[in-house]
Amino acid sequence: FGHALHIMAGNVATLQGINDLADWGANSVRCNIGGGSICSTRIQTGHGHPGLQTIIDCSHTDRDVAIIADGGIRNSGDIVKALAAGADAVMLGSLLSGTREAPGEVFTDAQGRKYKTYRGMASKEAQVDWRGKYSSFEGVSSTVPYRGKVRNILSDLERGIRSGFSYSGVRSIEEMQHNVQFIRQTSAGLGESRTHIQTRKW
């Protein structure tokens, strides 16, 4: 295939890991272990690393390799933070689950609500379908509401990312990475970040 073949490898959670895969020929590396919404790797194996810190650590590589933030992306704000931390791109799983284009059949419950199955590749069910058996399973399967066309979700994510970049006054991922400033946030600060409207009792 020559230079037309792009090799993506992973997953790793350390600078040494990304350097090794780059030295072995990877063009891009998926970074993060056990951060996905239906992933149980950290619990099952005792291995893993906080997702954002993984991206920061891996971004210190001096190899010519793209960093893919993989797992734990829950909203457009998480995408902005992953890109700012050093990722060149992100992989999405749960954010796109339940869409028309996602794998699986649509089924309807007794109340007429539509759902699709969402499962990780390391789940018991996926391994049995793939290999006819399973070894150590590191994920679960779940059902998620049917969400229609994926383009609607992608459009919402795009708008959120553009807005996030505007808050930092940047026009590109490279600009964001050169100008970003991270701070530590308490759990109270995180709670404040979420919507918390109080209803008035008359």
Where do the model's predicted regions map?
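Conserved residues at beta->alpha junctions
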Residues: N11-V12, I73
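Acidic, glycine-rich loop-and-beta core segments that form the ion-binding/anion-interacting portion
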Residues: V12-I38, I43-G48
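Alpha/beta catalytic cores of nucleotide-metabolism and tRNA/nucleoside-modifying enzymes
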Residues: F1-L5, G17, W24-N27, G46-A69, ...
